[in-house]
Amino acid sequence: MSAQGDCEFLVQRAREWLITARSLYPADFNIQYEMYTIERNAERTATAGRLLYDMFVNFPDQPVVWREISIIISALRNDSQDKQTQFLRSLFETLPGRVQCEMLLKVTEQCFNTLERSEMLLLLLRRFPETVVQHGVGLGEALLEAETIEEQESPVNCFRKLFVCDVLPLIINNHDVRLPANLLYKYLNKAAEFYINYVTRSTQTENQHQGAQDTSDLMSPSKRSSQKYIIEGLTEKSSQIVDPWERLFKILNVVGMRCEWQMDKGRRSYGDILHRMKDLCRYMNNFDSEAHAKYKNQVVYSTMLVFFKNAFQYVNSIQPSLFQGPNAPSQVPLVLLEDVSNVYGDVEIDRNKHIHKKRKLAEGREKTMSPDDEDCSAKGRNRHIVVNKAELANSIEVLESFKLARESWELLYSLEFLDKEFTRICLAWKTDTWLWLRIFLTDMIIYQGQYKKAIASLHHLAALQGSISQPQITGQGTLEHQRALIQLATCHFALGEYRMTCEKVLDLMCYMVLPIQDGGKSQEEPSKVKPKFRKGSDLKLLPCTSKAIMPYCLHLMLACFKLRAFTDNRDDMALGHVIVLLQQEWPRGENLFLKAVNKICQQGNFQYENFFNYVTNIDMLEEFAYLRTQEGGKIHLELLPNQGMLIKHHTVTRGITKGVKEDFRLAMERQVSRCGENLMVVLHRFCINEKILLLQTLT
């Protein structure tokens, strides 16, 4: 105890000596600084604060003072909650407000790193709102200039983030800051570009910041959703933005009020905003040039943001793996396709048209117009999209987003001055490189029935995917490649280009993962109220799984071969392919099969040497066995490989003919034993093994 008492005595005497020395030599900096050091180390906040204030006033040129002030201000910017940092913050709070402001300004002036200087100045603006008028716009412009000088490739960078999220709200919400309209539009443009790019950043961009990781982990939605996106130059906390869309629309509203737009009071839905913009467009020609320019900007920016928000919502719902964060659940992606579920319907042949004439659709559908035939805007309305709620729980909201995005796009291109301004913005933002947007535009074009444009858009999509290193899914081609193939197939089919349809379908078959159970009844057709639209005008959102896509592919192939099989011209090969494909979802195709049997009966004979390789349906086997009997019409069937050559050979005898009959009987018996085989495996083998033959049939 004695030793401790001695120490306390010495410390106390030292303090007294310093106080005495300070009184004797008030102009001596070393004495003042020594006293400050003792009080700071003892964590006596009030005393240390007074001494720091005295040094700041009396010794402003001392580097040690500024080093100390810099340490304190760094603590203000630091998110850490350790004891030392909290003490330094408390020390700063003891200083008079005027001194705090002056300190922040001086430290900022001495900082030559643009990012650090901006963060210092931002600290000043937040603590002293009255300084926004003097320094706010200058800081904003400095950040935008730094972004240009540093040649940032992406708008999602540290300078833009500080400007859009931190500085801009301070500027535009301070009514003492006078801003011309053109500057407000410039800032709104910068904010929109940043937030949209931030929200829609792809997993590829994210992975570049995360460093090399295992590919299988990157493809896992659960792993991806737990990763944090960090903007280079900022901390993890500073890089996270809560409710970016909400922030963007708040900026839109504030800019709108400052620019005297026709604003509505209260919160309005995206549908309400779009409806208001449509109304405003009707009266645009009635305004003078100044008002016209003002409301043009209102329509362009309001409609554009509604478009991007809803297009993102749609793509994020059908292909969440494109985006990072908690919005990427382990959900199967969906793909928009023409509905061909009525493929088992009867065939109506136009006798005046050549069977292969383009845009003559299968299954008696009405002619699908190409963009060369009619105005797409009239055709692209009121098409019904079928979606199974089990595959997309929020299907109503997703389809509403798709509708709002389409209508916004149409409005932006409905008037020349809107088109011109929106195109200018898109060029500046390089939206043609946005993979997610190209996915939406492709689906929109398919919806509009502009299939030639859709094919071009899909090729553009493939080029975009090629420019981004896509991780491979083990055992499959990339998901994007499969999506493109099936959508190309559906577009070629709608154009009546059946050989190209089959080519894409058969390419896609290589990626199917087997076995797939054939459920008999269609798995892809949810119960729905049939809309009163023209027959065959429906679309459907199908899951990108082998279970859903393979049956759809087989439907497309059946639709392609149907017209050729049931023409006046005989084509046993096409008819045979149809019979093989009709096994899927049996007995849905029973009526079409009976039509095929009737055609065979009219012909009196039928040759299809692949019959026993791929027909395993017991009802079909029984029907063909019956056709050979007296009661069945004693139809001459050549269903065995090389059977035709045997019969046509000049040495044909009754014995050989009898042998052929015996071979047929044995083949039928063997075939009956195969009826338990997985039909989808059989049909998959049919598509893979007979690819050349299938394509030749459609040539």
Curated annotation (Swiss-Prot):
Keywords: Isopeptide bond, Nucleus, Phosphoprotein, Ubl conjugation
A Pfam family per the record: INT10
GO BP annotations listed: RNA polymerase II transcription initiation surveillance; snRNA processing
GO-annotated cellular components: INTAC complex; integrator complex; nucleus
Residues recorded with modification Phosphoserine: 220, 370
S-S pairs: none
Compartments (UniProt record): Nucleus
Cross-link entry Glycyl lysine isopeptide (Lys-Gly) (interchain with G-Cter in SUMO2), positions: 453
InterPro entries for this protein: Int_cplx_su10
Family: Belongs to the Integrator subunit 10 family.
Summary of the function given for this chain in its UniProt record: Component of the integrator complex, a multiprotein complex that terminates RNA polymerase II (Pol II) transcription in the promoter-proximal region of genes.
Subunit structure: Component of the Integrator complex, composed of core subunits INTS1, INTS2, INTS3, INTS4, INTS5, INTS6, INTS7, INTS8, INTS9/RC74, INTS10, INTS11/CPSF3L, INTS12, INTS13, INTS14 and INTS15. The core complex associates with protein phosphatase 2A subunits PPP2CA and PPP2R1A, to form the Integrator-PP2A (INTAC) complex. INTS10 is part of the tail subcomplex, composed of INTS10, INTS13, INTS14 and INTS15.
Protein name: Integrator complex subunit 10
Source species: Macaca fascicularis
Gene this chain is encoded by: INTS10
